[in-house]
Amino acid sequence: YETLNSMKNIQSSSRKRVQACGFTLIELLVVIAIIAILAAMLLPALSKAKSKAQGIKCMSNLRQLTLGWIMYAGDNGERLAPNGNRVNTPAGMLATDSSFQSGGANAQWCPGRMDTGTSPYDDSFIKAGLVYPNVNTTAIYHCPADQSIYPPGTSFGKPRVRSISMNCWLNPITSWNASQGYTGAQALKIFRKTSDFSVPGPTMTFVFIDENPNTIDDAFIVFDPNQNNFWPNVPAS
């Protein structure tokens, strides 16, 4: 009888210990609330770190493109790669003006538009450009932070292959004139060769820039240095 009572006491004591080790509903809610607070504190920091990493990668892409652009000039008598908005096909573009590399197909730094046809998601247009042989990768033509698709606002859109554009005053194929809305266009500085970078100097002139997905079209970004409010194309934010 005493042995039986002892066993009952042991079982009762064990059940009490098991019950004592459990969490109450309030304790579980407190733990969940703490986890939620910690997540809310960490997520902005993680998002900021991701944005910073994307910015660093984008700057690296611009640097590589600029080096490829400089190499092109070095191989072509210091003439800058033609820059413009010629026909939207990888082949058949000609630039016969003496200021450009005369003749030859695909005579511009990067053909194709990001707002029409198949070129927004076809990297063969990038590969047909004059700078590509010096960089040999299409990835650097696109900023990792750019999540835009074409056609925009659709469920079947595809990521654009390019978000980078070139300064429109660096050996433009299209001739600027006053009728296009550029104030004092004839007096604006157009750079044809590396030796033209005198005023302003190279450190005051940008070559490539990440363009806003709402305005990106051809591969050059159009702006008027004489008018602060005249930006047909807008840099990415």
Can you say where each PLM-predicted feature lies in the sequence?
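N-terminal leader/signal peptides at the extreme start of proteins
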Residues: 1-25
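Compositionally biased amphipathic helical and low-complexity segments enriched in hydrophobic
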Residues: 5, 12, 26-30, 44, ...
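Short amphipathic alpha-helical "recognition" segments used for binding
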Residues: 6, 12-15, 31, 54-56, ...
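Compositionally biased regions
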Residues: 7, 13-15, 48, 164, ...
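Coiled-coil-like amphipathic alpha-helices with heptad-repeat character
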Residues: 10-12, 47, 137, 157
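Generic hydrophobic-segment detector
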Residues: 12, 26, 30, 39, ...
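Amphipathic alpha-helical segments typified by the pilin-like N-terminal helix
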Residues: 18-60
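Short, well-structured segments within or immediately adjacent to enzyme catalytic domains
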Residues: 58-237
